[in-house]
Regions:
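Acidic, mature catalytic/reactive cores of soluble proteins
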Residues: 1-169
């Protein structure tokens, strides 16, 4: 499992690679959603919108008014199983150590199922705009190549400095 944020875009990519398998394998991916500010935890509530729409190789949803739609897509055809549930009591020990609230409930709209073969990679995307699933592997590779390695103090400083770059439009 490898995670990477796309530069200058509100999108995370997660790549799963099946290193070894001795039989047919199905990847089941269950996204946990919050739709909240960074310091405001959420708890199970009836205001959460459970609606979703199908998009190419995925779904889009928006839990609350005023938030952007969230597009969740995979680079490969898959099946989305609508199975809405709240996962209660998720805890964040680091936040507890810092003296902050540390407990919340997260909404899971359902799960994606996709067959995966030995040596194959599946890329999952979550972002506020739709993306062509055919581009996901290439975008992941490009972002990974542009990433500063964290193999020395200098590179760690360089990486930290790059986190403050703003894209001017």
């Amino acid at each position: 499992k490898e995670k990477i944020f796309v530069h200058h875009e509100n999108r995370i990519l997660i790549r799963y690679t099946l290193v070894d398998a001795h039989s047919a394998t199905t990847l089941r991916f269950r996204p946990f959603l919050a739709f909240r500010s960074v310091r405001e935890y959420t708890h199970e509530n009836p205001q959460a919108n459970r609606d979703y729409q199908l998009v190419e190789n995925g779904v889009k949803t928006c839990m609350y008014p005023g938030y952007p739609e969230l597009f969740m897509q995979l680079n490969k055809k898959n099946e989305f199983h609508f199975d809405p549930n709240w996962y209660r009591g998720i805890e964040y020990p680091k936040e507890q150590e810092r003296g902050y609230d540390f407990n919340e409930d997260l909404y899971v709209p359902g799960y994606f199922e996709v067959d995966i073969k030995k040596g194959e990679s599946i890329v999952f995307s979550a972002g506020i705009s739709e993306i062509s699933p055919r581009r996901l592997k290439q975008v992941f590779e490009t972002e990974a190549e542009d990433r500063t390695p964290r193999d020395s103090f200098y590179h760690c400083l360089k990486n930290s400095a790059h986190q403050f770059h703003n894209k001017q439009e």
